[in-house]
């Protein structure tokens, strides 16, 4: 394929990407915040709107999901310091990590146990609100817990929701939609874990399985919705609502950092490492963080060596016009949540001027990191959620990047946040298998 040869000449890093080697890519198209935000299709108002909507729904969430009672129906996760893991990383990789290391435990988000509880649940709630307002079931001034009634469930049962997923988005959309009363179908790709399918079916969700990858599952979900006017399709590749649901995480994180007395400013940079599949979750979170911290936050996406779709799309500038399969990469990885061959064009183009860089990590490395985190901090994440954990090691080793960004002298006063995207709902026997694999790879 001649085009690929041309791309290889233009982007030499592509050779390593094709060889599924671990790479670190600095985004040459990143702009200063004030420039980037001018051309952005989304802004602060959009994120505020999403935040307000989640507040309106909080009484309903607290009522139907008792695990959110303590937080009054706000779906949020802990931010924890992980000093023992930091020491282990420094020792294992022989690389000092300057600054403090924290883990954002979206793995322990209530309801669906992953970052997808942010965007997925938000989009379903927004759709439910629109229908309920349109048909006079609700006004914005109401206590939204009135939606927990047979009348409302019967009303929502006349509508359906569809989504294509590798697993975690399906869990959040499926659980939330079924709770409201919608008929919900999750189209799942070949790499979706069995326990995720079983859990969804136990909640009354219709699960359709495919032998093909994520893109096919999304395509089929879209087709189902197109054929049925009462069916709403959650489009993980193009959804602004999902993106905004994730972006709300930033203001929540800001409060947590303030509670921990962690300063973020020009002298105290913040580095955030986000596992990336199709791009919605990390894209939304990164966008929200840039709105708050502007040029003082540096966001990096992390992808499996066998599914580096966003890195490929950003580096070549082709976005969703190129898939990893086009350059001979198989898109087969144990990091099921990140097993995506073609990135979201909407996310890639939106986040491009805000993103600091992107790197890849091997499955073997994910398992080793999984075991290490379990041993040092007693925190258990699923393999894909560990993709961010190697980020601080990689960034601290990038002297050229740090000097160029005038960060070298500031690193000691900086903060690194690894976004732990999922894991608390993994069945014990499955998690034990992951741990064992990590152990075998270390021995």
Curated annotation (Swiss-Prot):
Q: What is its EC number?
A: 4.3.1.18
User: Record's superkingdom?
Assistant: Bacteria
- Output the Gene Ontology terms for molecular function: D-serine ammonia-lyase activity; hydro-lyase activity; pyridoxal phosphate binding
What cofactors are annotated for this protein? pyridoxal 5'-phosphate
Catalysed reaction per UniProt? D-serine = pyruvate + NH4(+)
* Residues bearing PTM N6-(pyridoxal phosphate)lysine: 116
To which protein family does this belong?
Answer: Belongs to the serine/threonine dehydratase family. DsdA subfamily.
Mind telling me what this protein is named? Probable D-serine dehydratase
Instruction: Provide the species name.
Output: Bacillus cereus (strain ATCC 10987 / NRS 248)
